[in-house]
């Protein structure tokens, strides 16, 4: 079932999502060569709790960390660890909070030091495709319009769209209906209505679209071990168009 939110509920969601954006901003101050991804997880958990919220990923279906941190060829759901970031890495940070009974969710892929130009181009295209998808998140469109916009933008530039993982509705639960794929056909899928809140999150690979799941049961990486990028915003569909909730 798709739950439509009232204006008041969307304002409460904005608080949880704004904190996610603030957390990403705090992490950006620390992402550099020489820091471990586990240290970033600790920084995020303390920041979220200090701001009166709960890290919503921690314990979700048994996930053991506050952040999903995925480095280079890892696509999503990577575990923070003792891995020390080095110059040239790219790191996807997926962060969720719960505040006032509502969830926030956002992801951003950061460059660590000097990154190869072709990898930076992948990150730019993935981020731009997110906004192409958001442009289609308007009342009267369908979920397929979002996926088509993301897929078309990325594939025209020679990148591939991960199929196994998709965006989702968001509200009192981290994952609600509907699923929001990053691929699709215009005019298909669930109808977008005022009050829907969805997380749009392109996961785009430099090489093949194919992925594999690591032995930890969570981490997803590209099969060909080429880099991947991941950007995400939580968005409310309003009578005035899409409203990005995770933006500062």
PLM feature segments, named:
Residues 1-248:
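Active-site neighborhoods and metal-handling regions in enzymes and metal-associated proteins
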